[in-house]
Amino acid sequence: MSRRRHSDENDGGQAHKRRKTSEPLEIEDRLESLICRVGEKSTSSLESNLEGLAGVLEADLPNYKSKILRILCFVARLLPEKMSVYSTLVGLLNARNYNFGGEFVEAMIRHLKETIKLNAYSEAVYLVRFLSDLVNCHVIAAPSMVAMFESFVGVTQEEDIPQVRSDWYVYAVLSSLPWVGKELYEKKDVEMDRILSQIEAYLKQRQKLHVSILQVWSAEKPHPQEEYLDCLWAQIQKLKKDRWQERHILRPYLAFDSVLCEALQHNLPPFTPPPHTEDSVYPVPRVVFRMFDYTDAPEGPVMPGSHSVERFVIEENLHCILKSHWRERKTCAAQLLSYPEKNKIPLNYHIVEVIFGELFQLPTPPHIDVMYTTLLIELCKLQPGSLPQVLAQASEMLYTRLDTMNTICIDRFINWFSHHLSNFQFRWNWEDWADCLSQDLNKPKPQFVREVLEKCMRLSYHQRILDIVPATFSALYPASPSCVFKYGDESNSALPGYSVAVTLTNEIKNKASDKEIFNILKDIPNPNQDDDDDEGISFNPLKIEVFVQSLLNLASKSFSHAFSALAKFHDIFKALSESDEGKLHILRVAYDVWKNHPQMIAVLVDKMIRTQIVDCAAVANWIFSPELSHDFTRFYIWEILHSTIRKMNKHVQKIQKELEETKQRLAKQHKHRDSDDNDEDSGRKDGPLEEQIERLQEKVESAQSEQKNLFLVIFQRFIMILTEHLVRCETGAIDVNTAWYKNCRERLQQIFLQHHQTIQQYMVTLENLLFTAELDHHILTVFQQFCALQS
């Protein structure tokens, strides 16, 4: 009653209260907008904007200090491309309010520890770099920053830790030095020399078995593919030699030097790196992607050399822009093209190199592949007079280096290039690539052109490809995507099952029931069964052939027709695929019908897995079967296999998630029961949930067993075919390094790299059963390289 009366009597008061509570929210939103947008397009200078914003924030500190702290920590972590802008802002605030500066430093250290514990190492790097830049702004005392770096480098002395842990701490130090190296050397040169000596000693004894599995190209010319720490070390060494002078970092705090140098500084608290645990997941090592040098951009500004720190700073800033804005291509493209100091560098070349560097990054790109495609299209629209030419030059370079390019990266190049062409009327000067026509069709260049045309056909239609590509390329044209029905021609009437296929086709057209179709199929003799074998066997290849050929031919009009046919006759498919041989033969027949239409094969296999007509292991066995050997290096085959693995992984994850959610529900029930002793029903409610958990636990174990078996099948098949090749070459005194061998070995690497997080669970099994010491070193090295990624 009292609540209702209060509401009734004070309607006006309540509205007034709502306004009062909304005002702080409006002010907080305004503060967030002001901070996040500082340094963007404005009629006044950056310096005056920063000074004005510092004044606004200082005035709001009494009421909104915690909110301001939270926003500044947020931008330090998630807007690294504007780091020096925000470090200057913090410097100005510290000069006006010393206590706030101290609280901000403490908050940043807390954030850093939390970020490391959450395995968010890329964000942690930005926090370390931000702290180091605060030394330049007279917020943090240089000796305490040096002490933090010493504790970071001390991690290299820890025992029984993976190398990737030490790598990250060394990288965090080295990657901060372009910003703060000069200041630290002026104040603490002896200590800094000691830190760099420790880093040098560590880098010399690091194992680098992982490098070759991460390289885009196997050749070191024209540009070496350097390991990321080695490259950064060379850049820092050159920077030190140049007395820490660089010309590409925006340093707005220099304009406020007279104000900032009067400010009191803070000492960082002693920092102990969080210890290594079983849950720690460190960043995978990288190889620095290099595509251009100063000779490729002869006009305009000169591109910095690969070992100049300016190259690192520019690339790092462009990567930061991609990381911050990748979800919105228009904003991302605009931010890239409005890069500060863009007139001092060949910006388009840097942008294209950085984007391709991310697209080709191994094991996986930072973002989905299609993001890079749409971003490059947007950049071409914004810079139609210059960027398309740089992109064409890059495409030409990639094509000329296909022979030494990693097969995984060739796949990504095919996907990007075909998608890009589809947005520009498929315009390309194909005659420039006519050199591929004189090569063996199994070589990378003709294979690349063939797969690009295949992909372009998916994005248009067959006749369009024939119209736009010169007739001289006819050997690489995609086949006309029509089905091959072996029972459709009367000249094949002598084929076993021909008459049944004709009958079956008519009955399906007349909407026969499953029972009627079963009756027709049961009369088909089994070629695997002897006349005197009364028991018979369940697997009848001819029965499968007649049914699948006839049905897929009738449903050949479109993907939708094919899907409807699989759904309508699902029970018959299930009956025919009871055995492993049956599943395998269904896949063989589907391939025979649609061998001229790889996309149809891919979507049919996908649908058959989803509807459980075939299982994932059957698909793996089919891919490695002799019938598919002539298509083994084709793009679509690996598209199917990786799609199959992803489905299996998602299936396991889905059941694991169900199990976790059910366990959480049970835990909540227990908590509720403990707080309510009189609830007699709660004990009875536990029963069904506990039974459900038991069932889900069994399902998880079964699914994980299937998953492990799938990887065992795949790796076993790889080992078999690679071993056969190696033995054949050794016996015949033939060179091992054929185009097929390169492709096959790199496809094995691809399985490891694309599914590395899942495969990590089964490392012991793989090492004990398959990748043993007795295995040929050509194959075993791939496994060892994979292990080195997290060692």
From Swiss-Prot:
Name of the protein described by the UniProt record: Nuclear cap-binding protein subunit 1-A
UniProt-listed Pfam families: MIF4G (PF02854), MIF4G_like (PF09088), MIF4G_like_2 (PF09090)
Function: Component of the cap-binding complex (CBC), which binds cotranscriptionally to the 5'-cap of pre-mRNAs and is involved in various processes such as pre-mRNA splicing, translation regulation, nonsense-mediated mRNA decay, RNA-mediated gene silencing (RNAi) by microRNAs (miRNAs) and mRNA export. The CBC complex is involved in mRNA export from the nucleus, leading to the recruitment of the mRNA export machinery to the 5'-end of mRNA and to mRNA export in a 5' to 3' direction through the nuclear pore.
The family this protein is said to belong to: Belongs to the NCBP1 family.
InterPro entries recorded: ARM-type_fold (IPR016024), CBP80 (IPR027159), MIF4G-like_typ-1 (IPR015172), MIF4G-like_typ-2 (IPR015174), MIF4G-like_typ-3 (IPR003890)
Region Disordered, annotated ranges: 1-24, 664-687
Gene Ontology CC: cytoplasm; nuclear cap binding complex; nucleus
Keywords of the record: Coiled coil, Cytoplasm, mRNA capping, mRNA processing, mRNA splicing, mRNA transport, Nonsense-mediated mRNA decay, Nucleus, RNA-binding, RNA-mediated gene silencing, Translation regulation, Transport
Subcellular location: Nucleus; Cytoplasm
Subunit: Component of the nuclear cap-binding complex (CBC), a heterodimer composed of ncbp1/cbp80 and ncbp2/cbp20 that interacts with m7GpppG-capped RNA. Component of an alternative nuclear cap-binding complex (CBC) composed of ncbp1/cbp80 and ncbp3.
Gene Ontology terms: biological process: 7-methylguanosine mRNA capping; mRNA export from nucleus; nuclear-transcribed mRNA catabolic process, nonsense-mediated decay; regulation of mRNA processing; regulation of translation; regulatory ncRNA-mediated gene silencing; RNA splicing
Boundaries of every MIF4G domain copy: 28-240
